[in-house]
Amino acid sequence: MHKLVPAAIALALVLPVGALADTSSDIASLRQEMDSMRAAYEARLQALEQRLQRAEAAITPPAPSVAAAAAPRAVVASGPAVTAATPTAPASAAPVVAPVLAEAAPATPQVASAGGGANAFNPSVSLILSGLYTRTSQDPARYAITGWQLPAGLQVGPSTRGFSLAETELALAASVDPWLRGAANISLAPDDKVSVEEAYVQTTSLGEGFSLKAGRFFSNVGYLNAQHSHTWDFVDNPLAYQALLGTQYGDDGLQLTWLPPLDQYVELGAEVGRGRSFPGSDSGRNGAGMTALTAHAGGDIGASQSWRAGLSMLNAKADDQLLLATNAAGGAVTDLFNGRTRVWIADAIWKWAPNGNATRTSFKLQGEYLRSTRTGNLVYDIGNTDRPGAYRAAPSGWYVQGVYQFMPSWRVGLRTEGLDAGTPDYGPNAASFAGGGFKPRKNTLMIDFNPSEFSRVRLQLAQDRAREGITDNQLFLQYQMSLGAHGAHSY
Amino acid sequence: MTNRHCLFTLLAAPLLLFALPAHAALRVFACEPEWGALAQELGGSLVEVSVATSALQDPHQIQAKPSLIVRARNADLVACTGAELEIGWLPVLLQQSGNAKVQAGQPGNFAAADYVRKLDVPGQPDRSQGDVHAAGNPHIQTDPRNIALVAVALGARLRQLDPAHAAQYEKAQADFAQRWQQAMARWTAQAVSLKGVPVVSQHKAFVYLYDWLGMKEVAVLEPKPGVEPTASHLQEVLSSLKATPARMVLYSAYQDSRPSEWLGKNAGIAVVKIPFTVGGSEGAKDLFGLFDDTLARLLVASAKP
């Protein structure tokens, strides 16, 4: 009671003050609102006045040419649709015509040429066209990586010889609403198969550096994994990606990335997914078949250099994964793997361009190291021997590549890479496999010519020693073209 | 106890009024130096400006590098040219920034080209025409009248984002507008002799400058926008100059000077390096210096026999 009384008095004293503060802050905010409204109108008025002056100045030249005098009238009458008329006007008249022409455009000059109507909200569409000529000294149908057990459907090595269509990629992207954007990449394979490479929605509004993606996407592990094939610097992905991540790891799930509030670039990411592809296997379980953690940091060194480096980890579960292998006798067998795989990836890239202007010359050096541990059990020779046993392997792979743009439109690149199957522990199946110890190696040289930002022709030569005792000399001639929306590429 | 909590809350509440305006300066991330300089003119000490590119870089071709992503992440306002100039890199920056405030359509996303009348708007955009921009020529900063228009819009945007300092922004804007009008009057008077002067451009980057000064572009060294000049096209331009002579050839500070120098030597005309944006030359230290220096260079070149 004693305490309540002074409290009540204090409350009674404070409340009106609070109320006063409220009204005065209300007034202040109202005033601010009015001020900003007034400012906005003033801005528009000033802009309109200036336009009017310019229009008047342009319409009344001392002695206008016939074309210049006629064109504005025609344009004003029929609106922006006639903009095509400008290029045909004589060069001398163009500067006079142009200002007047644009005056006819609406006051809010937002993308008037977007096409209006129902199509105005169409997503941006781009289509990548790509084709190959391949020449190899060994038959690609018999391509294998000695000492490695990989799933049957996995594409490793060159796909075919001679002329072939490469992947055709259709990309669609647009804002969903003020809070989300969506994108899809549909891949049309040369064998007429259609696959959904990526199809996701992504938040734009979480703020605080957070971004959430849901759907199918390429995992953010490593450097090359998230990049679409048309942005690769070589025709093919490194062997390490082919043998450890099934060329490129994509999954259905969720991806959360966060940029902490720092002046230094740090990006942290976490992913959960179905585990639908190698090194996982699609098993339809309720839980996550894949989890991944990524961390990247980057920055500039002066005006001419920039870098990014990172460490990622990907876990995937495999149930009844069929693997093609070669046994000690040199025969082809199919094994069955059950277990889990953990892939660690360290990646780094360094780019240089004089004063940060990559138009004329630039250089980039990148490298990644991938190490995978597969633990579980392996049933040897399905359908014949059917012998189960514990299995543990720690294969690894790496590549280093440099790409130098020595003059506008021309680049040359060199890549060297290697694989190490490690010393797998086959348990009771040990006697069925050869000792191994062979380390595949590959060196690749490429030169590409980019007539514009949207087209590229590339020649690639490679010496591939993925098979023990066999050297495959490969030649590729490739074109990659982009139609439609101007793509924006990540670093 | 609960009463006392209420009391403390009531007493503490007004403190929030002091706490809120005390936050750090408005962080402006400008895509090009001209908008960084303009934001600095209009915001003074109220803004903290960071510029993504320098005058020595081609604004069409910038990489969405980590240092830019982190600056976009921390920005309150992203001020860019728009009109697809930054289409190859800004969308990636914004996507990866995780910053809701600066996404397209938000008050924190400002595109200067939305507030000016654009030239070279293609009727039927097609890439056979080179790297054309469907929204029109994006190099709007070469006309000081455009700077004036953008200043009005950017000032309004700063007041909208930071209403607590609206009066200060308004004052800075009025001050800038006055100085700019005076400068424009001076430049216009200085540039009278440039009216009608025929010129060659290396890239179609100066249409707004020509529109302002009444200069006439008779040829372009790039066969198509964004395509590097070829030897055969340079020869064509050289021979076309016999029929329609030009007085000078212009290129931007970030460009390779060799095509312009080749033409200058072979056609016997002046070669002019245009600073193009703030920082593009010794003299172009700020927006005023940019136009002072641009005009000085053009006048020197046009005075040559």
List each language-model region with its residue ranges.
Chain A
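Short, surface-exposed, charged loop/turn segments at secondary-structure junctions
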Residues: G284-L293, T326-A328, G383-N384
